């Protein structure tokens, strides 16, 4: 097994390929990509034996923007016999001898064609899990040091990749997709983007400390209030900045102040440090990056989650430019900070970025 399979949003295979090639090279790992447009996954094949496993251990999954999941795989199994699909899969795993495995996930790429296999995947999981347990596998806790999850990626009927991922360096979600329910009282479906961002960027154990009823937030381009809703739900008082109207349900909470102003010109009230800045405005990504940079450098906010709408072409390059700009500006000013970006499931032609400022040198 010396390949990586990376799941992604259909249509973002080239961005995923460019990113894994760059990140692998930074670790001294080289290889080549096999991809099919709109397939929802790519294969990165390493030149050196053992390098795929090294990437799965050392390349921090949270650093990858476009990948939803990262697993080590071997050659594709093709034309699995209908009467016995399990034996060829078990045979591939026997070479690995995954005694430190915790569970099995039988998945597909996130495309309409592949998802037709999901019913089969669910039914197939039970007998496959039983067979793997008979081998003495799937016995470890997913929290055990060095434990792995076993993953099967079915790309079409009878054809799959057999692989694994390290539990401490992968998405915990089936197919790399968090299943979020749209809250009936939320003003717009965009609320799921911020909910997924919080789930992705903020450790669950820290969430109640990072969002409290003593905190203040600003939502630039807030109308009708999908993102404001997520902050208010967590107790934060929000200055909702938008010329448009906010949902009446948010006004009724008493936890927002509507500021009918231009998001690019708004400044926080004097002597008021904003704990959270959020922004989902439709604007050129570099213009948004400069706006966010201004807020952070001026000390107007401590932490921010914002979206960057991507151009039709050179999307990965645009992301690199925007993130490099923000990192350089913050470093120039002597800030200690953490920056993460992710192409979330609920994002479309955009990525979501999180920056937390921890202090100054």
Curated annotation (Swiss-Prot):
GO CC, alphabetical? cytoplasm
Residues annotated as binding S-adenosyl-L-methionine: 190, 223-226, 242, 262, 280
One Pfam family named in its UniProt record: RLMM_N
InterPro entries xrefs? RlmM_FDX (IPR040739), RlmM_THUMP-like (IPR048646), RNA_MeTrfase_FtsJ_dom (IPR002877), rRNA_MeTrfase_M (IPR011224), SAM-dependent_MTases_sf (IPR029063)
- Superkingdom of the organism of origin: Bacteria
Please give the subunit comment from the record: Monomer.
Its family remark reads:
Belongs to the class I-like SAM-binding methyltransferase superfamily. RNA methyltransferase RlmE family. RlmM subfamily.
- Full protein name: Ribosomal RNA large subunit methyltransferase M
Task: Tell me the name of the encoding gene.
Answer: rlmM
